[in-house]
């Protein structure tokens, strides 16, 4: 399965990163960076109405190359100017053609919070995320046990970062809540089959208490989708592909927002 391949590649990537910068050094640097240029991701998603997390995404396993002319800094600035609440940056290099450098450079030019979107399976990546400037990290229930998820949440929050905890079914929602997640994202894409079911957010919304921030991810393509989510008290949406492929990011984002 593609998810297993991504996780296996991530393990290799993390071990290589540790050879460049030790765990001890990464942790020390993260603690020194604890409040440096920090912007609250949670606060940005707590505003009334639907808040947009707009994604900077070059490629994906399901769609292949999404952006041939990948001017990631210009894209991020366009998102910010058009009213995005936050920016999600893919840093996974093997399957999504992402890069830590993209996040670092984007963070240096925007004022809104930046989410690191990657497959985080080692606490080293949490410390690394704070060092590179991430305001929030994605934690995926499908690749983490309850104990590890809880540990990662506590580590990230101890560094001042928010966590978007991603779930795909009832069991994962229960795990996320039990672990203490404050921001829960429901992925409408099944990470094992990569099939999309927009109704997944609607089905799982009722399981998440209203005092938590609820984010709908993947497969959101139309204003009608946004209106349905809004009617179901969804706090935020994560959109990437629809914007990246539009040809005019600002215009497409305005169409979905307004």
Swiss-Prot record:
Q: List residues traversing the bilayer.
A: none
Which EC class, in a word?
Answer: lyase
Enzyme Commission code = 4.1.1.48
Q: Which domain of life is it from?
A: Bacteria
Per the record, the GO terms for biological process are: L-tryptophan biosynthetic process
The similarity comment for this entry is: Belongs to the TrpC family.
Its name, as the record gives it, is: Indole-3-glycerol phosphate synthase
């Amino acid at each position: 399965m593609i998810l297993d391949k991504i996780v296996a590649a991530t393990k290799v990537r993390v071990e290589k990163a540790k050879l460049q910068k030790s765990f001890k050094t990464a942790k020390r640097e993260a603690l020194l960076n604890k409040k440096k240029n920090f912007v609250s991701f949670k606060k940005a998603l707590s505003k009334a109405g639907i808040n947009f997390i707009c994604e900077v995404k070059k490629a994906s396993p399901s769609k292949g190359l999404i952006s041939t002319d990948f001017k990631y800094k210009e894209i991020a600035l366009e998102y910010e100017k058009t009213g995005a609440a936050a920016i999600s940056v893919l840093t996974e290099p093997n399957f999504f053609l992402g890069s830590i450098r993209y996040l670092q450079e984007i963070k240096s030019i925007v004022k809104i919070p930046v989410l690191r979107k990657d497959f985080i399976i080692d606490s080293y990546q949490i410390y690394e995320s704070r060092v590179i400037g991430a305001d929030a990290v994605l934690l995926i229930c499908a690749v983490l046990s309850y104990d590890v998820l809880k540990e990662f949440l506590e580590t990230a929050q101890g560094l001042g970062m928010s966590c978007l905890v991603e779930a795909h079914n009832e069991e994962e929602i229960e795990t996320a809540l039990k672990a203490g997640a404050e921001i829960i994202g429901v992925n409408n894409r099944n990470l094992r089959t990569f099939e999309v079911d927009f109704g997944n957010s609607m089905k799982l919304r009722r399981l998440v208490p209203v005092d938590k921030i609820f984010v709908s991810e993947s497969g959101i393509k139309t204003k009608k989708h946004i209106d349905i989510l809004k009617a179901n008290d969804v706090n935020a949406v994560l959109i990437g592909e629809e914007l990246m492929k539009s040809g005019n990011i600002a215009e497409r984002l305005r169409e979905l927002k307004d």
